[in-house]
Amino acid sequence: MFSEILERFIKDSPVAVMVRALLENLLNADKIDHWFEGVRQTQYTKEILFSSIVGLMLQVVCKMRPSVHCAYPHSGITASVVAVYDKLKNLELTTAQGLVRHIAGEAETLITHIAGMNPPLLAGYRVKFLDGNCLEATDHRLKVLRGTRAGALPGKSLVVFDPALGIALDVFPCEEGHAQERSLLSAVADTVQVADLWVMDRNFCVLGWLFRIHQQAAFFVVRQHGNTPYKPLKPLELISKSATGDLYEQPVEMTAPSGEKIQVRRVVVKLKKPTRNGDTFVVLLTDLPKEIDTLIIAELYRNRWRIETAFQKLESRLNSELNTLGYPRAALFGFCLAWVAFNIYAIVMAALRATHRNQAINETVSEY
């Protein structure tokens, strides 16, 4: 009997069945609690299971409920709402980050198995987009915030996005909302792997970080920051002209604070039409080998729209920035859970790409 019912849903609402199956498998309460026991440091379970907190927060993140307080009566949690908030405000950032990594690993396995990847941007390299996010200012619900007009910034994060898989591989959360993005790069550097290709905006054009990537046999394409020092080795050479702009390149030398030197390629795109920020040229630095065409390098950077689009989807489709939560750890946990939900959605999109290979699934399938 149940198989007939399931078959009807599979036929009439296949995506809904896929989402339900993924949620039941990847966010299964027993599995999540078992995972939590393996990663927790100072936290403990006591009255409220970690899986219950995940389920509660997902109701808010997925816009099923407007706030934690509204979701609480429907959560099945028997502990008081005060205990729930206490649990949320003490969640370790390593747990929030670890959950994103855990689900990303599961997503990568599934997407690879079904061959649902997007076409690679550059064969032989694992392209990773890096970008930052500052959570929006929160309401003044906490007593400590009621004496100030300014909204408190509950945190900041760096996100690593894989365009081939279409998922967030990692999130690096920070409780200091006013911290500079570059201050979080040391943690990101520990995750760099051989043949990675990190594509980044100028905020991440930091010599120590770029040299760390290079030292680990990985590569970078980064927009040059105005304060980044370099030594030209040859004049700019015109590579090509097009209707949108002219492409130039020159070899330059960069020197690390330690005195180490590397030769990189400086790519200049002179635009015929200014960007929305008024820029008439874009300057890139890369340590990719000479056999990689200059136009490909410019195209790699242009594809940063993929991570920008992912952030836009997170903001418009999910409640990723819970401005009702003044507790930094709680707000950052909500942000990380939004990426967990996004990655589950990415698996569904990958399955559709694998099934309908001759169709532009990313452009034609409605996300609602």
Describe the residue ranges of each PLM region.
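Extracellular beta-strand-rich solenoid/capping regions of secreted or surface-exposed proteins
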Residues: 146-148
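Primarily marks folded extracellular/lumenal domains of secretory and cell-surface proteins
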Residues: 110-116
